[in-house]
C-alpha cells in the first residue's frame, strides 16, 4: 500500500522493491517453502516513531497449506521460539539494556482476536469511538497488547479477520462472513508482521485485480499471472519487520533507535 521510489534503469523506469511478495508467490509452487531476509523500500511520507523508508524484512511464503490457521500458527510459533532463544542466550545483554520481562502464552499459542472484537472491546473499555474500522488505530494496537499481557500473560497477540473493504487484490476472501484471511501479529503495542492467506485461483485473481483497477494485461503482471494460470497451491506467508522486533524486544520507543543509519523523510545520509 505504500508509495514506491522510482529510478532510471537503462532508459526504463524501475522502482525499488516494497516487498518480494510476487516473487515468493511465483516460487512457492516449485519450492513449497520460501524464505528471504532483505531490505524493502517504502516512500511513506510518515514522520513517526513507527515508520522508515528503508526497512529490513524477513519474508516467508508457505505452499500446500491446509488453511490460514496453519500460516498463523507457523509464524506465531516461529516468533515465540525466536523470543525464547533471544531471552535465554542473551539474558545478560538484555538486562544491561533494561529490556522488559518477556511474557509468552502458557499454552504456547499466540492469542487471537478478530479486528471487530478488538474494536468492540476497545470502545467499551475506553469510551472512544473508532471511525475507520478497516484497520486498527495505533491506540487500539497498544490497548489490545496491554490487555493480552495483563489478562493472558502474552506479549504477542493476533488481530485477525479484517473486513472485506480492507482487502488487497491478492488476499483470499471469506465471502460468507465478509472478512479477509489476514492477520496482523502485534508485539508490545506494535504490528511486527502481516500474515495473510493468498488467493491462488487464476480466475478469481484476475477478477480481483480488475476490481482494484489494475490492468491485467500490463507487462509487469505477465509472469505473475502466468504462475497462477499454470497452477499455484493454497499458500500464505508473512512480511516480518526485523527492525520493529529489535525495537520492542529491547524496549525502545522509536524504531529508528533500533536501526543503524535509519532512512526516513528527513534523513538520507549517513
Task: Give the ranges of each region predicted by the language model.
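Short conserved micro-motifs at the rims of enzyme active sites and ligand-binding pockets
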Residues: 27-28, 47-50, 69-72, 169-172, ...
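Metal-assisted phosphate- and nucleotidyl-transfer catalytic regions
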Residues: 1-4, 77-188, 211-233
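Active-site pocket scaffolds in enzymes
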Residues: 196-197, 202-270
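Active-site lining segments that contact anionic ligands and/or coordinate catalytic metals
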Residues: 11, 32-34, 55-57, 153-156, ...
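A generic structural motif
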Residues: 59-70, 189-192
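A residue-level signal for conserved active-site and pocket-lining positions in enzyme catalytic cores
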Residues: 16, 30, 60, 118, ...
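His/Asp/Glu-rich mid-to-C-terminal helical/loop segments that flank catalytic regions of hydrolases
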Residues: 31, 35, 66-88
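Class II aminoacyl-tRNA synthetase-like tRNA-binding/catalytic domains
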Residues: 1-57, 61-65, 247
Amino acid at each position: 500500500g505504500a508509495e514506491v521510489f522510482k529510478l532510471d534503469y537503462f532508459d526504463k523506469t524501475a522502482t525499488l522493491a516494497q516487498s518480494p511478495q510476487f516473487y515468493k508467490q511465483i516460487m512457492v509452487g516449485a519450492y513449497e517453502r520460501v524464505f528471504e531476509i532483505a531490505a524493502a523500500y517504502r516512500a511513506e511520507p510518515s514522520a513517526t516513531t513507527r515508520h522508515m523508508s528503508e526497512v529490513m524484512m524477513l519474508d516467508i511464503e508457505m505452499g500446500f497449506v491446509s488453511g490460514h490457521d496453519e500460516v498463523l500458527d507457523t509464524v506465531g510459533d516461529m516468533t515465540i521460539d525466536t523470543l525464547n532463544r533471544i531471552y535465554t542466550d542473551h539474558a545478560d545483554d538484555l538486562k544491561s539494556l533494561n529490556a522488559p520481562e518477556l511474557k509468552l502464552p502458557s499454552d504456547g499459542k499466540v492469542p487471537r482476536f478478530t479486528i471487530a472484537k478488538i474494536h468492540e472491546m476497545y470502545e467499551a473499555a475506553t469510551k472512544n469511538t473508532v471511525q475507520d474500522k478497516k484497520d486498527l488505530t495505533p491506540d487500539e494496537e497498544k490497548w489490545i497488547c496491554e490487555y493480552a499481557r495483563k489478562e493472558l500473560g502474552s506479549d504477542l497477540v493476533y488481530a485477525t479477520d479484517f473486513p472485506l473493504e480492507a482487502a488487497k487484490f491478492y488476499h483470499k476472501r471469506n465471502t460468507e462472513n465478509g472478512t479477509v484471511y489476514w492477520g496482523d501479529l502485534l508485539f508490545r503495542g506494535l504490528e511486527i508482521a502481516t500474515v495473510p492467506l493468498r488467493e491462488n485461483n487464476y480466475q478469481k485473481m484476475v477478477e480481483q485485480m480488475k476490481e482494484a483497477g489494475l490492468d491485467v494485461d500490463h507487462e509487469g503482471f505477465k509472469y505473475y499471472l502466468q504462475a497462477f494460470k499454470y497452477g499455484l497451491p493454497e499458500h500464505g506467508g508473512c512480511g516480518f519487520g526485523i527492525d520493529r522486533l529489535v525495537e520492542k524486544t529491547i524496549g525502545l520507543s522509536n524504531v529508528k533507535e533500533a536501526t543503524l543509519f535509519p532512512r526516513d523523510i528527513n534523513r538520507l545520509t549517513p
